[in-house]
């Protein structure tokens, strides 16, 4: 399997799972509230945008580096999504669960900003091999983006 094909598969499968989670959670969490169809659809679309847009922003800058970097960033961003989805679903407090998704949003916006450095400057340590690109993009998505997201949340 080629490097590009692996990147495409990881991005498509992760996006499909995130979209499915967004629509199913929107429907089943609001069904007892007896919302109208228009309100339910509005909530589902806003939920979809708030979950999938940061995910896309996290791996998009790595398109300009190498496909293995896209794979590493997409899989680590998807791992973060799974962690936050499981954490928010096990919380009893709805405000706490909402705060978890705000942290997810800031973390992946930080990942998008962290991905700008390798995309613009294409450092040699990042582009030398596919394995390095995969591991470093995953580390940038998890560690560096946490620092940037934390700083953004403190400023905002």
UniProtKB/Swiss-Prot annotation:
One GO CC term on file = plasma membrane
Could you list this entry's UniProt keywords, alphabetically sorted. Cell membrane, Membrane, Transmembrane, Transmembrane helix
Q: How does it sit in the membrane?
A: Multi-pass membrane protein
Q: Which residues cross the membrane?
A: 7-29, 42-64, 69-88, 98-120, 133-155
**Chief place of localization:** membrane
- Could you tell me the superkingdom of the organism this chain comes from? Bacteria
Indicate what this protein is called per its UniProt record: Uncharacterized protein PM1189
Its source organism is: Pasteurella multocida (strain Pm70)
């Amino acid at each position: 399997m080629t490097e590009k094909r692996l990147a495409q598969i990881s991005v498509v499968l992760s996006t499909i799972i995130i979209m499915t989670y967004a629509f199913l959670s929107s429907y089943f969490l609001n069904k007892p509230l007896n919302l109208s169809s228009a309100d339910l659809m509005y909530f589902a679309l806003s939920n979809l945008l708030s979950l999938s847009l940061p995910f896309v922003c996290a791996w998009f800058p790595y398109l300009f580096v190498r496909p293995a970097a896209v794979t590493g960033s997409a899989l680590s961003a998807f791992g973060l999504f799974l962690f936050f989805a499981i954490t928010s679903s096990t919380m009893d407090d709805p405000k706490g669960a909402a705060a978890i998704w705000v942290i997810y949003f800031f973390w992946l916006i930080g990942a998008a900003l962290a991905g700008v450095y390798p995309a613009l400057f294409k450092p040699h340590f990042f582009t030398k091999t596919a394995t390095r690109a995969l591991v470093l993009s995953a580390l940038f998505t998890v560690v560096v983006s946490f620092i940037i997201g934390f700083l953004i949340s403190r400023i905002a």
